Amino acid sequence: MGEIYTVRLEPVGVEFEVDEDETVLDAAFRQGISLPHGCKEGQCSACKCVLLDGEVEMLRYSTFALSDGDREGGQILMCRAKAFDNLTIDLLNYDEEVLSKSIPVKQFDGRITDFRKLTHDIRGVEIELNAPLKFWAGQYVDITVTTEEGETITRSF
């Protein structure tokens, strides 16, 4: 574990801790705070916000999601931002009720037991998990797979 910093979300006043080794978005999820997001890969801009105070390192992201002009204007992507200071962030898109009532993110290990072609462009995947998963309507899952080359790929379903 690295240094621990505090993130304050404006205008709602929610605060949480972030380790310098994790992204702001991952830290929020770990502590049960649901923030707007989509791809978690810096491609979609759903987690775009304004950094009002503090310093972050931005991991690789698409300039379609965050243009150079956006970045120069103080905008960041929470899914690609690692804190190196206490942060104050201005949320651009949020639902205050969702922020306070979200379900903490849980991590499961699993093994792919079946992979089949359903149509020409849709595949079915069965995953055997190491623990039961309670599913709520509207919930989704992020699946991270490590390739034979050691690359990790995450997709949301």
Where are these regions (language model features)?
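Preference for bulky hydrophobic residues occupying beta-strand positions
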Residues: 7, 16, 49, 89, ...
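Iron-sulfur (Fe-S) cluster-binding modules
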Residues: 1-2, 74, 84-90, 95-106, ...
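N-terminal pre-ligand scaffold of iron-sulfur
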Residues: 1-36
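Ferredoxin-reductase
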Residues: 100-157
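A short, compositionally biased
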Residues: 1-5, 43-45, 83, 138
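Short, surface-exposed secondary-structure edge patches
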Residues: 36, 41, 130-134
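Well-ordered beta-strand positions in beta-sheet-rich domains
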Residues: 15-17, 76, 88, 109, ...
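Iron-sulfur (Fe-S) cluster-binding segments and ferredoxin-like electron-carrier domains
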Residues: 8, 27-36, 46-95
